[in-house]
Amino acid sequence: MQKFYTLICTLVLLLSMTFMAPVSALAADYTPVVTENEISVFLETSYDNAKIWAWNDKVKQFTTAEWPGDAMTLMGTKDGKNVFKWTYTAGTEIPTGVIFSHDGGQKLNGGNQEFKNHGYYVE
C-alpha cells in the first residue's frame, strides 16, 4: 500500500510540475501607471530596446542624448511585446512631436508622430 501511495504522489507531483509550471510562469500584462503632473509616453514594441526623440516649436530637443535620443525604460510586457516608458523631468513644456526608434536609429511607425501626454503607442 505504501508503494502505491508513493507512486500516486510521484505522479501527481510530476503532472503538476508539467502542466502548472507554464501557467504560473506567465506574468500579468503590464498596466501603464502615470503620476498626475508627469510628462510621459509609453511604447509597446517587439524590439528589446527603444529610444525616443521629442520636440516642439520652441524646444528643438527634449531628450538629453543626441539623435536617436534617450533610451526608454522597460516597464514590463503586454501580449508578448515589451512596454517602454519615457518621462520628461527637465521642465513643464510639453513636446508636440515624437519619434520612436530602435537599434541605432531605425524609426518605428514611420517616424514623426504627434506627441500625446501619457500616450500609449503601439508598433
Task: Annotate each predicted stretch with a short phrase.
Residues 46-92, 105-112:
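Aromatic-rich carbohydrate-binding modules that target alpha-glucans
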Residues 93-98:
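Exposed beta-strand face motif in extracellular beta-rich ectodomains
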Residues 1-9:
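Bacterial N-terminal signal peptides that target proteins for export
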Residues 17-32:
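Sec-dependent signal peptide cleavage junction
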Residues 30-32, 113-123:
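Extracellular beta-sheet/turn segments enriched in Thr/Pro/Gly and aliphatic residues
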Residues 11, 37, 48, 80-82, ...:
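Beta-strand-connecting loop/turn residues
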Residues 35-41:
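Structural beta-strand segments of beta-rich domains
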